[in-house]
Amino acid sequence: MYKRQEDDYDSEFRFDTRPLPSLQGMAGADGPVVYLSTCSRSLAPGIRIAYMVLPEHLLPAWHAKYRLYSGTVSRFEQQTLARFITGGYFTRHLARERVAYKARRDALTAALNAAFAPGELTLTGLHTGLHLLAHLRNAPPDAALHAAARAQGVRLSLLSDYDLTGSGSTAPAPLCWVTARWRMTPAHRWAKR
């Protein structure tokens, strides 16, 4: 039986560093890791194709149990994606996406750094993924920060939204999560506001 499950979230978007090897790749074809991923961030959320790479020793059991299973994604979409990948188009697409998202990230970090006094803001998580963390030194209460950002047309996901202690919106917001996959004014225009 497998012992580890790896969800390779945003691994294809590393900007200033080399990609990390997957646990499944390091463990080998028959290692104890089941690798899970999706195309929703790298291609489009609407495609809704996820995949898993099973260790070889689990393949017979998988085929026996799920050979008649019909997924929710049509065979046409699956085969189209397979040809997109095997034809090298996916690799080229990811290279273009990395350049585009790196430019967005750079514009966003420049705009954020310009908007705060030195020492008031520290950004982390810049080297990978489609998000970053903004550490605010003298942060207003979470609800006030969220309202001010929304008034400017900026959608923030605050880490306190995921706080299980219940302190939520009354606590200071030392951290907020900013995603580069927004559907609003492009980041390069933020600095002009």
Please place each PLM-identified region on the residue numbering.
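Structural signature of PLP-dependent enzymes
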Residues: 63-66, 87-109, 139
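Active-site PLP attachment segment
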Residues: 26-61
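Conserved glycine-rich beta-strand-loop-beta hairpin in the small C-terminal domain of fold type I
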Residues: 99-109, 121-135, 145-148
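Short hydrophobic/aromatic beta-strand micro-patches
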Residues: 53, 133-135, 178-180
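Short, small-residue-biased leader/transition segments that mark boundaries at the very start
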Residues: 1-2
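Active-site C-terminal subdomain of aminotransferase-like
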Residues: 57-77
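Conserved Walker B
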Residues: 8-10
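PLP-dependent enzyme catalytic core of the Aspartate aminotransferase-like
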Residues: 151, 167-193
